[in-house]
Design a protein with these regions (language model features):
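N-terminal hydrophobic/helix-forming segments and targeting peptides
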Residues: 1-468
Length: 468
C-alpha cells in the first residue's frame, strides 16, 4: 500500500531553492556574473549595448550577414539595425524550412530622456527638461546621481557620442526634491503624483559665464556657461540638441548585494539581464541542429514601437534574408519555429505580499521563470503560450538539468505588464516568456539573484542547442 508520504512525493511539486539542491552551483554562478556586472557597467543604453555586443560577437568569430551568400552549418553572422538593435545567428544542420530557434530579449530600459529643446535657466540655476521613458515610478528618480549618455548629430553631419558621469572624476547630475520641512502639501499628493513629470528637471550648473571685457553681464549667464562647457567638451550648440538622443541613467555601478553577495544590484537589469544571458548563450552555441536567431531589440519599454522595436518588421526581414540563403519558404520557416520571449518577471516581495498570489509567483534563487501569459484583466494584451509550447520548453530544460519555475506577474486584477511575446507570435511562431525574476523592477537599482542569472544562461543555451 502506498503511504501518504510516498504519494506526496510522487504527486505534489514545489520549486526548490537552487542552493539547497545544488551546493556546487554557487561557484559557477558567481564567476559567470562577474562578466555580467562588467558588461552592465559599460552598456547602459541600447546603443551602448549594441556596440558592446558587436565587439563580443566579432571576437567570437561572427561576421556581418551578407545577402545572397551561401552559409554552412556552424557559420556565425550578425545584423545591426540602425545602431540600436541587432540579430545574430549560428547556422544549424537542419534546413531553414524546419524552423529556427529564436530567442528575443530587449536592451532598452526606463530612463529620463531630454526634450528636444531642453536647456533653460531659472533663478540663476541651469537645468535640462526631461521626458521620462518607460513605466517609471517618478518619485524614485529624484536625488539620484545621474549620468548623461547619448549621441548628437552636428550640423555638418558628424555624430558625437556623449558620456558624462561614468568615469572617475566626472561630475554627475541630479533631479531635486523638496526638503521634508516644506513638504506638507507635497505629502498630500497620491504616491504616483508625488513627483510630477514636469518636475523631473535635471540640475546642470549654477555658475555664470563671465566675460571681463563686458561691463554688463549677458542674459541667462548660467545657461550660457553650461552651454559653453558642453561646447568645449563636444563642440555642440543649443541648436544641436534638436538632432540628438540624450538619455540620463543612474550613475551607479553594478554591485553585489547582501552579506553573502548572492544578489546583484544595478540599473537596467530589465531586460539587459536576459539580453546578456541570451548573447552569451548564442556565442557559446557551436553546432546546433536548428539555426539559432538571437534578437536584442529596442523600444520594448514603450510598446516595441518604432523601426528598432519588435513591433516593426526588422526581425521578419532578417528571417526572410536568412531563408533566401537556402531558397527556403519563409512561411514554413516561421510556422515551424519555436521561440522564447526573454524578459524578466516581478519576483515575490514579502514586504508587499498583498499584490502577489503566492502559489503562482516567482521567487529569487529558484531559477528562470517560465511565464505562460502576462497582460491584465482577463489576460488582455497577452500571448498565452500553448500547452504544447510549454511542454517543449520544459522538456528541454529538464533534460539539461536546468532549475526553473513558473510564475505570473502579480495577483489577478492587481496590475498589468507585457513583453515582446505577442509580436513574436504575430509572425506565426510558437513562443513563451522565460526570464529572470527581478526585485525593484523599473527602479534605478534593480535586484537579481546570481543563481537565477546563471541558470537563465543555461536555459537559453539548452534551448538553442536542443534538436527537439
Amino acid at each position: 500500500m502506498t503511504t501518504a508520504k510516498e504519494l506526496q512525493k510522487n504527486l505534489t511539486w514545489e520549486f526548490p531553492h537552487i542552493a539547497k539542491k545544488n551546493t556546487a552551483a554557487k561557484e559557477a554562478a558567481f564567476a559567470y556574473c562577474e562578466g555580467y556586472k562588467e558588461f552592465l557597467n559599460t552598456a547602459k543604453t541600447e546603443r551602448e549595448f549594441t556596440a558592446k555586443a558587436v565587439e563580443k560577437l566579432a571576437a567570437a568569430g561572427y561576421v556581418p550577414f551578407e545577402e545572397g551568400k551561401a552559409y554552412k552549418p556552424g557559420d556565425k553572422v550578425y545584423f545591426v539595425n540602425r545602431g540600436k538593435s541587432l540579430a545574430m545567428s549560428t547556422f544549424g544542420t537542419a534546413p531553414l524550412e524546419a524552423g529556427v530557434r529564436l530567442n528575443a530579449a530587449h536592451i532598452d530600459s526606463p530612463r529620463l530622456d531630454l526634450k528636444p529643446n531642453p536647456v533653460y535657466e531659472n533663478h540663476e540655476m541651469a537645468y535640462f527638461k526631461t521626458h521620462y521613458y518607460g513605466g517609471i515610478r517618478k518619485y524614485q528618480w529624484v536625488t539620484v546621481p545621474l549620468a548623461m549618455h547619448g549621441v548628437i548629430i552636428k550640423k555638418n553631419g558628424e555624430l558625437v557620442k556623449v558620456c558624462v558621469g561614468e568615469n572617475a572624476g566626472d561630475p554627475v547630475f541630479c533631479v531635486t526634491d523638496l526638503l521634508p520641512h516644506l513638504g506638507a502639501k507635497q505629502n498630500e499628493r497620491k504616491l504616483g503624483e508625488g513627483i510630477k513629470g514636469e518636475e523631473l528637471n535635471i540640475v546642470i550648473g549654477s555658475l555664470p559665464f563671465v566675460d571681463e571685457s563686458e561691463e554688463e553681464g549677458v542674459k541667462d549667464a548660467i545657461k550660457l556657461n553650461a552651454l559653453a562647457l558642453l561646447n568645449e567638451m563636444y563642440g555642440i550648440t543649443e541648436h544641436d540638441f534638436m538632432r540628438a538622443e540624450i538619455e540620463f541613467v543612474p550613475a551607479t555601478k553594478a554591485q553585489d548585494v547582501g552579506l553573502d553577495r548572492s544578489l546583484i544590484g544595478a540599473y537596467g537589469q530589465d531586460d539587459k539581464v536576459c539580453a546578456y544571458t541570451a548573447l552569451t548563450a548564442e556565442i557559446d552555441t557551436k553546432a546546433p541542429y536548428y539555426t539559432t536567431v538571437t534578437v536584442l531589440a529596442d523600444k520594448e519599454e514603450i510598446g516595441s514601437y518604432g523601426n528598432t522595436g519588435l513591433n516593426s518588421d526588422f526581425v521578419l526581414h532578417y528571417l526572410e534574408d536568412l531563408a533566401a540563403t537556402q531558397g527556403a519558404n519563409i512561411r514554413k520557416l516561421l510556422r515551424n519555429t519555436t521561440a522564447l520571449s526573454s524578459d524578466v518577471n516581478g519576483a515575490y516581495d514579502p514586504s508587499f505580499a498583498s499584490v502577489y498570489e503566492e502559489r503562482n509567483s516567482c521567487f529569487v534563487n529558484k531559477g528562470p521563470v517560465l511565464t505562460k501569459y502576462t497582460g491584465a484583466r482577463g489576460k488582455s494584451g497577452s500571448n498565452d503560450a500553448s500547452a504544447e509550447t510549454m511542454a517543449k520548453v520544459i522538456s528541454i530544460m529538464d533534460e539539461a538539468d536546468v532549475f526553473w519555475q513558473i510564475g505570473e506577474l502579480g495577483a489577478v486584477d492587481e496590475g498589468d505588464g507585457g513583453t515582446v511575446a505577442l509580436y513574436v507570435a504575430a509572425m506565426d511562431m510558437d513562443v513563451v516568456d522565460l526570464g529572470v525574476p527581478i526585485l525593484c523592477m523599473h527602479s534605478p537599482f534593480e535586484l537579481s539573484s546570481k543563481l537565477d542569472v546563471y541558470y537563465t544562461y543555461k536555459a537559453f543555451a539548452a534551448f538553442l542547442e536542443s534538436s527537439k
